[in-house]
């Protein structure tokens, strides 16, 4: 039998070559065992693999028998998803809480298999303007597109859809899926997931709209839904754009022609007269903008979306932006059955920062000349600048994490973090390094990146003060205690290979080592099949703990969330530490009576 992933690769190529193709009989791929090994491989390394839904069902205990039960329930129509367990997490920069729906692991497994199938069909047809929850795309690819394509914009329209994920209309979504997939069983299964409901305080609630945030399928279903918005905005762009290289302002053309005339004169002159004309030439070159000044009749619309956040740049008037906003409002209400937030959908002049994906975005308006070595360089007037919102995002991070306090003169004073004192020295420095590197990596595209240097200083001294407070010592004694003689400091620790030292992250090395280019990979997503090691290990029918290799014995996967949390006291813990794996294939007896003997 041909591997399912090889079939999906062919389906993906067909979808790419013919975007109007309609696909049928997809449900049968959910009745093949191999897709569940791939799904498990994708899921088990995630933190949520050990998070329980409403049942005691996690990545632990996965087996061939479990796959057979899943396939049988899908085949005879007896499978119904369990309600998700609702929990709440704090929203960033808000006192409001965001609801998350945690499915059971069996439901996650089936959702992941469905996601793999749907992605092979939809990924090739999604528009390039969409960057959220897609292979080879990220926040950075969205921001790089903005930097590359939004140059010369006069206005920004910052889009916000009210409660997007919570208000996706189920009937509309299934209708959109049915346009591309003619498979009643697959549509019914997706509809079952949407209507599964949720448990909160052990009370069942029905779901009438929305996709549960936390579900495996939710991001892809949201992209399928908002793909209609992408298509609409691109159609709007075709109507709106009125770009012509001839529409250069008379003032720009006159200055440009004058510079050309002086340039021709320079070739014929010598001595003092040439020096005098050269000075005049340089003065006029300074006044010439890097980008041609175009008249207001030159109209261009650009658009980028990441999940439910989108931004539009407009070369045109404010009235044009208001017209675009009204068109969006009507489409989102009539077609998507959702509402564009009037208060949060802002029209911002490009000289002022527009907020998108945690960055401030604005268009440079400066003819300033900068010197780089012996060469004079003009700044790119009209180019896009990405900035870190230091007084907003970074300031809020410092407050939230209690890294520093602000004094009366507005300067910052680093302080210790009380809630970290019970952690080990190694854990404390690891937390600080992780936070610092995370922020530096995310804001690596910003032109004011070096201003994070002060933030790095606050992080370092907050870390030192936290360790000093833990040991009830002074800051200077703590620095002396952990210095290595070269001026750097770090926490010593020991592993099997010998003594090691974890240094505090050096700011100059915190930025991602990968070159930030303006190119987005256009390589197709391959779904080629290669039997994964986990499938091989299960099918080998050999217990990796006791060595049993009985064909008639049931074998399961024992799963842990983090290998580093294992103490190494039990035989199975030593086996997992030695293999440095989160999974161990064991026989039924070992799993129930050796590993889970105390449960």
UniProtKB/Swiss-Prot annotation:
Family annotation (InterPro entries): AI2M-like_HNH, DNA/RNA_pol_sf, Domain_X, GrpII_Intron_Splice-Mob/Def, RT_dom
Catalyzed reactions per annotation: DNA(n) + a 2'-deoxyribonucleoside 5'-triphosphate = DNA(n+1) + diphosphate
Region annotated Intron maturase type-2, chain positions: 381-549
Record keyword Hydrolase present: yes
Protein's UniProt keywords contain Nuclease: yes
Cofactor: Mg(2+)
Key words of the record: Endonuclease, Hydrolase, Intron homing, Magnesium, Multifunctional enzyme, Nuclease, Nucleotidyltransferase, Plasmid, RNA-directed DNA polymerase, Transferase
GO biological process: intron homing; mRNA processing
Domain Reverse transcriptase: 70-361
Domain of life: Bacteria
Entry's EC annotation: 2.7.7.49, 3.1.-.-
GO molecular function, one term: RNA-directed DNA polymerase activity
SUPFAM superfamilies: DNA/RNA polymerases
Reported uses of this protein in biotechnology and industry: Mobile group II introns can be retargeted and used for highly specific chromosomal gene disruption in bacteria. Could be useful for genetic engineering and functional genomics in a wide variety of bacteria.
Role summary: Multifunctional protein that promotes group II intron splicing and mobility by acting both on RNA and DNA. It has three activities: reverse transcriptase (RT) for intron duplication, maturase to promote splicing, and DNA endonuclease for site-specific cleavage of recipient alleles. The intron-encoded protein promotes splicing by facilitating the formation of the catalytically active structure of the intron RNA. After splicing, the protein remains bound to the excised intron lariat RNA, forming ribonucleoprotein particles, and cleaving the antisense strand of the recipient DNA in the 3' exon.
SUBUNIT field: Homodimer.
Family: In the N-terminal section; belongs to the bacterial reverse transcriptase family.
Extra facts: The correct folding of LtrA seems to be facilitated by binding to the unspliced precursor or intron RNA. RNA would serve in part as a chaperone that promotes folding of the protein into an active conformation. Purified protein lacks endonuclease activity unless complexed with intron lariat RNA. It may preferentially function in cis by binding to the intron RNA from which it was translated.
Official protein name in the record: Group II intron-encoded protein LtrA
Chain's gene name: ltrA
